[in-house]
């Protein structure tokens, strides 16, 4: 089973003290060691770059990006079919945000149902199972 990894995991690991830091680190260590089969998407990588660059941390953006791609080298593209499915999810599940819908669309279009994230918005999306990341 392949698990999709959201941007908040590497960002919690790179950030300061937070209750989610250790569970995120523990999960990514399992990905790195091959205990967990994982993937991410180009949109997740864009989110990492965008957030750190918006805060003025361009060097940190590059470091987190590079480390995350090293840990999770399977990076799915975002296609027209994904944006169309995202649109459909936004209509079907109106309280879910665009980014979450896009991640879900990429996952569903690639036969992936599990996501590692701390974002509870995924709980409302049919066909998506958000993993519990308690250490």
Predicted regions and their residues:
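Active-site neighborhoods of divalent-metal-dependent phosphate/nucleic-acid chemistry enzymes
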Residues: 74-116
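Histidine- and aromatic-rich ligand-binding microenvironments
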Residues: 6, 40-41, 96-97, 119, ...
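Helix-adjacent hinge/juxtasegments
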Residues: 55-72, 76
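Short, well-structured N-terminal submotif of metal-dependent ribonuclease cores
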Residues: 1-40, 53-62, 135
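A generic structural signal for short hydrophobic patches within well-formed alpha-helices
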Residues: 10, 45, 122-123
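Structured helix-beta-strand junction loops
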Residues: 33-35, 71, 92
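Acidic, PIN/NYN-like endoribonuclease modules and their adjacent C-terminal/linker elements
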Residues: 2, 104, 109-135
């Amino acid at each position: 089973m392949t698990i999709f990894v959201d941007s908040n995991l590497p960002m919690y690991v790179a950030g300061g003290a937070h209750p989610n830091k250790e569970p995120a680190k523990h999960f990514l260590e399992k990905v790195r060691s091959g205990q967990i089969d994982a993937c991410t998407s180009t949109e997740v990588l864009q989110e990492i770059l965008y957030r750190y660059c918006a805060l003025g941390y361009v060097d940190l953006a590059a470091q987190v990006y590079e480390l995350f791609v090293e840990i999770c080298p399977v990076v799915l593209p975002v296609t027209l079919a994904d944006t169309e499915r995202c649109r459909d999810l936004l209509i079907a599940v109106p309280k879910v945000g665009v980014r979450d819908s896009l991640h879900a669309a990429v996952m569903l279009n690639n036969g992936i149902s599990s996501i590692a994230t701390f974002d509870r918005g995924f709980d409302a999306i049919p066909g998506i199972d958000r993993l519990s990341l308690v250490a």
